[in-house]
């Protein structure tokens, strides 16, 4: 299923961890698919249009997969509202990050790293929560243009 000009649903449900553990990682509601389509149209497609092809490390996660990868209990990945973007280099990542900060639909923007591997977590909410909980920072650097706390990647 095509979510936007350059993104397919399969890119968001594909998971090496799910495959290895025998987890079926498929969206279980139309709402999740609509959320992914919104994320694509409002955030990821503009990023791709500006910089060319991008790779999604993690998109939709069913609850079992989210638990297996150590995701937070209320992860936006489980609602189809978030994606982790592979960074070809730190310099390109900084360009992605600066561009994503300009997009009004971006809800969370987090620069994360584990060892020498860096990625950007980005989310967008199609249906806005009037009182969103602050996210767990998970050891990564946190930056959201909608919150007062600002850290650079």
Protein language model features and the residues they cover:
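Single, functionally critical "micro-switch" positions that shape active/binding sites
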Residues: 61, 76, 122
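Active-site microenvironments of hydrolase-like enzyme catalytic domains
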Residues: 69-84
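Extracytoplasmic cell-surface/polysaccharide-interacting catalytic and binding patches
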Residues: 1-48, 139-153
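A broad, low-specificity signal marking well-ordered, structured residues that form hydrophobic/aromatic
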Residues: 54, 83, 120
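Catalytic cores and adjacent binding grooves of peptidoglycan-active enzymes
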Residues: 79, 87-153
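Extended, low-complexity, intrinsically disordered C-terminal regulatory tails
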Residues: 41-70
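Amphipathic alpha-helical interface surfaces
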Residues: 36-43, 65, 81, 92, ...
């Amino acid at each position: 299923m095509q979510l936007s000009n350059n993104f397919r649903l399969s890119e968001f449900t594909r998971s090496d961890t799910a495959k290895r553990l025998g987890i079926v990682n498929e969206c279980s509601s139309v709402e999740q698919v609509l959320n992914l389509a919104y994320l694509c149209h409002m955030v990821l497609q503009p990023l791709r249009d500006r910089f060319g092809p991008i790779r999604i490390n993690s998109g939709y996660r069913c609850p079992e997969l989210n638990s297996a990868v150590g995701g937070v209990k209320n992860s936006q990945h489980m609602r189809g509202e978030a994606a982790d973007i592979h960074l070809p280099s730190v310099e390109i990542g900084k360009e992605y990050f600066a561009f994503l900060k300009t997009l009004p639909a971006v809800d969370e923007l987090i620069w994360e790293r584990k060892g020498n591997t860096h990625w950007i977590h980005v989310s967008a909410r199609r249906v806005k929560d009037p009182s969103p909980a602050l996210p767990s920072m998970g050891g990564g650097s946190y930056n959201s243009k909608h919150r007062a706390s600002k850290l650079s990647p």
